[in-house]
């Protein structure tokens, strides 16, 4: 990998990329409020579950969309996007995916200036597609020539860091703890990338009941710091 590709991966994979990720907790807020997550070990377990679920759903969408971009199959990109959106059962998850996806597209047209990204944002604004974050990420990175494996790694990193960053503000956990968790999950992320690279939207699955139960709890929560 050349330096140019690496810096682009670092830029667009940055946890402080201005797409609004800081407003979401990926479900960990409710998990902490209900006591499911209460220490470093349970936080690590929650992140692991989220990464596995992301690989078998959003990650496959990333790969399917990336392959469609490479094949210049724009209908395929839209199919992958709706497949991701339709498997998000709770409203908060759909809100997170589409809001961040649109923000990424809006930012990227000013940074990358690629006709495919402009087309993609137009499809989102016209309601022709949902504009989910995983598929938008695939479109933006594939347009820059970044490989599908690297984009899946970016997505997995984003899922983990969204949860860990939120946990820092919600429970007694240190920066050292969260970085150690992320480092320990490296081998698992490698396996999850293999799952995602199946890339078949017909095999996508979002079945993790605890996530939807926690989302329902979050909607009715009296105090909420995050949007999901």
Curated annotation (Swiss-Prot):
The GO terms describing molecular function are: nickel cation binding
Q: Which GO terms describe its cellular component?
A: cytoplasm
Which keywords does UniProt give here?
Answer: Chaperone, Cytoplasm, Nickel insertion
Q: Where in the cell is it found?
A: Cytoplasm
* InterPro entries xrefs: UreF (IPR002639), UreF_sf (IPR038277)
Q: What does this protein do?
A: Required for maturation of urease via the functional incorporation of the urease nickel metallocenter.
Q: How does it assemble?
A: UreD, UreF and UreG form a complex that acts as a GTP-hydrolysis-dependent molecular chaperone, activating the urease apoprotein by helping to assemble the nickel containing metallocenter of UreC. The UreE protein probably delivers the nickel.
What family is this protein classified in? Belongs to the UreF family.
- Name this polypeptide is given: Urease accessory protein UreF
**Native source species:** Yersinia pseudotuberculosis serotype O:3 (strain YPIII)
Originating gene: ureF
């Amino acid at each position: 990998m050349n330096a140019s590709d690496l810096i682009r991966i670092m830029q667009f994979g940055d946890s402080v990329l201005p797409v609004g990720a800081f407003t979401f907790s990926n479900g960990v807020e409710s998990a902490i409020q209900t006591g499911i997550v209460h220490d470093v070990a349970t936080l690590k377990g929650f992140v692991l579950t989220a990464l596995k679920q992301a690989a078998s759903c959003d990650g496959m969408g990333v790969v399917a969309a990336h392959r469609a971009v490479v094949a210049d199959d724009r209908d395929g990109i839209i199919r992958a996007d709706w497949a991701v959106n339709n498997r998000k059962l709770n409203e908060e998850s759909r809100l997170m995916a589409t809001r961040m996806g649109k923000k990424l597209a809006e930012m990227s047209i000013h940074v990358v200036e690629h006709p495919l990204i402009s087309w993609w944002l137009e499809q989102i604004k016209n309601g022709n597609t949902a504009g989910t974050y995983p598929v938008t990420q695939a479109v933006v990175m594939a347009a820059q020539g970044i490989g599908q494996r690297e984009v899946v790694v970016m997505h997995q990193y984003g899922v983990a860091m969204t949860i860990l960053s939120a946990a820092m503000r919600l429970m007694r956990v240190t920066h050292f703890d969260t970085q150690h968790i992320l480092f320990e999950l490296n081998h698992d992320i490698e396996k999850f990338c293999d799952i995602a690279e199946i890339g078949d939207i017909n095999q996508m699955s979002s079945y993790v009941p605890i996530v939807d139960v926690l989302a329902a709890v979050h909607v009715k929560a009296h105090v909420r710091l995050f949007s999901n």
